[in-house]
Amino acid sequence: LNVGNAKLQKTSSNTSITDGNGNYSIAGATYGVFSDKDCTKQLAPLTTDENGNTDIVEVKAGTVYIKELSAPAGYKVDKTVYSLKVEAGKTATLKVSDTPKVTDTLIELFKIDMETQKDNPQGSASLAGAEFTWKYYAGFYNKDNLPAEATRTWVTKTIAETDSDGTTHYITKLADAYKVSGDSFYMQDGKAVLPLGTLTVEETKAPNGYLLEGAYMQSGDKSEQIKGLYVTQITEDGDLAVLSGSNQFSVSDKVIRGGVKIQKRDLETGDTKPQGSATLKDTVFDIISLNDNSVLVEGKLYKKNEVVKTIRTDIEGIASTSSDLLPYGKFRIVESEAPDGYLTDGAKPIDFTITENGKIVDLTDEAHSIYNQIKRGDIEGVKIGAGTHKRLADVPFRITSKT
């Protein structure tokens, strides 16, 4: 008889993505064996098993045409029409591979300041260098049933990037330019991709000058604030793999804030007690920003060298701000008005930095206090005789203080 046999063997075109991932299977793919290249006259069906093999079908010797009719789980349908030459009395095997469905639409994270909602850091803080830990799981999970171990893990950081109009953004995503550590990326067609499964991401290190606590992600529509771990899935949608939810998020961090306390002292005595009837109360100090970036103080943005706050001393000569007034950065205290009985002479500016959240920088010791010169004057007395009104020489006077 002029007949032979045809069979098919299927593999994955990208085993680095599909091996060990239960979302992909080469079992269940269906093919048609046709006598014509237009695939209108089907001779027999073929279905792959878990190893990608099909049963043998008997066909007339010659050339047959084979086309995939339905792809197995996780794969794209191969639209190629293959020709297979079958010899009489022999078995011809067609070897084919399917492309796994992946997404190259990866999540982008934009770091912003929580208070200003802008991508400009405050003071001397930075929005670059925030670190995010990404975990991929080869299965579909939610936050409550994630496995203890991820299939792959990556750590990336935010990097400053300037767009065409000169605006700087602080961005991170799953790409080598942002990678700090972790596994190799999944690759297909020269691009970093994500297979079908579950992806989580969480900020694990705040950038310099910001707090990790309270950080949240938000998609472009500014709807839900996502705190802590964000979980999304990559699922099949027709011939594609799609990321559930948004692929762009802003990530807001709260800037570190602190305060300052300053002591007024007498320049001559070095003491915190005034001389005579002078007072250390109501000394006026200006707090000036020394930062290249703007700072937000009491709801208003201030530029470099602008006065951000004015404070006054109490009866003890101490002036203080709240513990959350000033953002992370460098500032200067300048005396703008001396207290009653004192000159501004000797009052030197003091620079200080805010680096710890909720801490008041204490400038009340002798080395950091601001000193003022007491006002001084001379007196002149004339002694005259009671009856003559003549001036008397060499008469001693005693000067006593009433304060």
Could you say what each language-model-derived stretch is?
Residues 1-403:
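Solvent-exposed loop/turn and edge beta-strand elements of beta-rich ligand-binding domains
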